[in-house]
Amino acid sequence: MSVLSSILGMVVLIAIAVLLSNNRKAISIRTVVGALAIQVGFAALILYVPAGKQALGAAADMVSNVIAYGNDGINFVFGGLADPSKPSGFIFAVKVLPIIVFFSGLISVLYYLGIMQVVIKVLGGALQKALGTSKAESMSAAANIFVGQTEAPLVVRPYIKNMTQSELFAIMVGGTASIAGSVMAGYAGMGVPLTYLIAASFMAAPAGLLFAKLMFPQTEQFTDKQPEDNDSEKPTNVLEAMAGGASAGMQLALNVGAMLIAFVGLIALINGILSGVGGWFGYGDLTLQSIFGLIFKPLAYLIGVTDGAEAGIAGQMIGMKLAVNEFVGYLEFAKYLQPDSAIVLTEKTKAIITFALCGFANFSSIAILIGGLGGMAPSRRSDVARLGIKAVIAGTLANLMSATIAGLFIGLGAAAL
């Protein structure tokens, strides 16, 4: 029954995308089937096949070790404040945000050394050959596995000005369907399962292309002519690369911290108002989370959450992520991952929630896309603005598809035990 419900969820998500497509007749069966096959095959390999699960675990251990090295720098700066066992306990601003700074610097060094470019070219080339997509959208999708929605398009910056509407939309969806490697480390610091975060990041690449090409198929002629490389902004050495990345990471961490202070406080204010008004009618426990849980509970059922209480919790997280952002969603989710949590979620539900939240698909991302892509190619700013809401919908569907597929194989694995 669980398998059938997951398959039904996948079919419904694809059907929604087809209904929202601007040209259903132009949908490429090769691209759609290929992208779905890659997503399902990769999920089966790392979430169901024992050897693949071991490889994913090894990758997660490696990333955890890298994070641990970053903690040395955090401990040096913050001392006892960075030790959760001390009286100060777990301090989000000390344990989570600085990891973003470290990872941002590390990724910049990997870019300087050319390692990231090689990996992106290999993965992007594989996607291009398998799906028949253009070089630009394939490379950007591959880059989104590791970096965020404003950094990934830099890989194909020379293409943006002249790319087709479908290509531009695919790049936007790739950004909304994925997260940045730097913030992934931050989510892991909150207790979100790192294995699922890594898996979701890789699955986001084919998922983003799948829903981008369903909702905005390629009808124009695209060009794969190699643009000229621009090394004018390349750091002079590794130290400058690390410093520049750390500086950018600090700005990101400050933005995340400021955003959380504002939004978490605003949510508390709204909950206070809702509980006060709800108390007049006998609903004193009414909150924004409970409203989201009610609205998105059917969606949680659709993507594979079978327990009623857990479906309500998953609905809360999905609503938070869409209305606010994924960081607030994960912050709420982290409460259910604590040892003293009153509600213990099943492993399948944990996976589904982690995958469903693992993307920048929220309404504030539209402004980020306009600023990022519009800055790289000012002539395309109006196109980005026009396609913004549709890109958020496509990115959300991509995240939900990954969550559904993950739930399917984790459920099969649990049933086989």
Curated annotation (Swiss-Prot):
It holds the Pfam family Nucleos_tra2_C. InterPro entries: C_nuclsd_transpt (IPR008276), C_nuclsd_transpt_met_bac (IPR018270), CNT_C_dom (IPR011657), CNT_N_dom (IPR002668), Gate_dom (IPR011642). It is a multi-pass membrane protein. Keywords: Cell inner membrane, Cell membrane, Membrane, Transmembrane, Transmembrane helix, Transport. It is found in: Cell inner membrane. The keyword Cell division does not apply. It comes from the Bacteria. The chain crosses the membrane at residues 1-21, 32-52, 96-116, 168-188, 192-212, 261-281, 286-306, 351-371, 392-412. GO terms for molecular function: nucleoside transmembrane transporter activity; symporter activity. GO terms for biological process: nucleoside transmembrane transport. GO terms for cellular component: plasma membrane. Belongs to the concentrative nucleoside transporter (CNT) (TC 2.A.41) family. This is Uncharacterized transporter HI_0519. It comes from Haemophilus influenzae (strain ATCC 51907 / DSM 11121 / KW20 / Rd).
